Amino acid sequence: MNILLTGHKGFIGSSLLKALELNHTVTGIDLLDGKDLLTCEFPNTKFDLVIHLAGRSGVRESINDPSAYWMNNVEASRRLFERYEDTRIMYASSSSAYEPDLNPYAASKYVLEELASRYSNTLGMRFHTVYSNTPRKNMFFDRLLNNKLEYVTTHYRDFVHLFDIINAINILIEATYVNGVLDIGSGKTVKIQDLVSNLPILMSTPTERQYTCANIEKMKVLGYEPKYFIKEFLTNSKKGTIIKLNTGEIA
């Protein structure tokens, strides 16, 4: 396939790019290349598929700058959807969309899903909490792996490994008859406090979801089965093992 991938230099996009290039021709658009989806000229190319991962993430930053999240997650997506209205589009959403009234980030993802529902060619991928060996800097999982957490919260989260996300996307690429919005996660929830001990406990804030757990039954019908789970991953990380991208094996 000839695929357009937005956000190809991001946390998920950079790994997805490597996986896609094994079997497809991929063109990337990313803000790090100076290509802002709000203003850039789109490639004058016929694509078989658009995978839209670009956008802003993070609850706390969205509270400080809600307009940026609206512009980057909603208006930029609107422009992309209109440009490629005759092309199949798979786009990244978030489990935060379940409770859009909690914060601007959640609201932007909810509106994104509502916007996409107006187009018959779209498929939403509602990612839950994604982690990997190389997490985003200064985010929760980065601090956890590097023993820099100062406290834990009372939240419950469905943690899904980056490579399970990549596998799910590859499955959905082939499932050309699927549309709507699908949950992508591990299908299991974990109490944050159970991941690390002997740290102060911070009560949950009203701007974040207390509990998340992906309903992956529809994904399982398509052949998706998560391979990695957070507690086993942390145990392997302490042993110095590394999960390889292309093989999914632990070395």
Where in this protein do the model-derived segments appear?
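NAD(P)-cofactor binding segment of oxidoreductase domains
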Residues: 50, 64-90, 114-115
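Adenosine-cofactor binding site in Rossmann-like domains, unifying the SAM/SAH pocket
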Residues: 25-42
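N-terminal Rossmann NAD(P)H-binding glycine-rich loop of SDR-like oxidoreductase domains
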Residues: 3-22
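Conserved Rossmann-fold NAD(P)-dependent oxidoreductase catalytic core, especially the SDR/UDP-sugar
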Residues: 78-106, 123
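NAD(P)-dependent short-chain dehydrogenase/reductase
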Residues: 102-106, 110, 114-166
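NAD(P)H-binding glycine-rich loop region in Rossmannoid oxidoreductase-like domains
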Residues: 41-72, 96-99
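C-terminal substrate-binding subdomain of Rossmann-fold SDR/epimerase-dehydratase oxidoreductases
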Residues: 151-251
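SDR active-site strand-loop-helix element
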Residues: 6, 29, 50-54, 89-95, ...
